[in-house]
């Protein structure tokens, strides 16, 4: 159960909030409050995923804050700061064919239709209008994630994304 490959990071704990053991939650879900859909939170601590029991979680205008069982005070909950929040991959909703969670694209190789290797996807950057693949290789490439326009094919089995993009961009 603690095999790291079965886990998806959905957020990260921030700093303590107030004096009663609340902690800020930085959600990696889109929209941010989708993190509330997952009940079975775990934290990677002491080289393994450990379950957390949420006592309270609140969405405020500028933050999500949570109170975790076993962390009743500011000093105790500060130990969670900067730790990742994970859920088992099986908790994620099934996607339609051709749709992907961003974590599935991270680490894939990127080539163009000529077979030129750009590098690997290291990050996906939201820009407002469309997301952008950040590809690191001999140089850094920023490629708009627009399936059918710039993203031609995603081969999950080979872990390769084919793009219509020039190496000189």
From Swiss-Prot:
Compartments where found: Cytoplasm
Record keywords, A-Z: Chaperone, Cytoplasm, Ribosome biogenesis, rRNA processing
Major site of localization recorded for this protein: cytoplasm
GO biological process: ribosomal small subunit biogenesis; rRNA processing
InterPro entries: PRC_barrel-like_sf, PRC_RimM, RimM, RimM_N, RimM_N_sf, Transl_B-barrel_sf
Any one GO cellular component localisation term in the record: ribosome
Residues covered by the PRC barrel domain: 97-169
Function: An accessory protein needed during the final step in the assembly of 30S ribosomal subunit, possibly for assembly of the head region. Essential for efficient processing of 16S rRNA. May be needed both before and after RbfA during the maturation of 16S rRNA. It has affinity for free ribosomal 30S subunits but not for 70S ribosomes.
UniProt free text on domains: The PRC barrel domain binds ribosomal protein uS19.
HAMAP family: Ribosome_mat_RimM
Subunit architecture: Binds ribosomal protein uS19.
Protein name (Swiss-Prot/TrEMBL): Ribosome maturation factor RimM
Lineage: Bacteria, Pseudomonadati, Pseudomonadota, Gammaproteobacteria, Legionellales
Gene: rimM
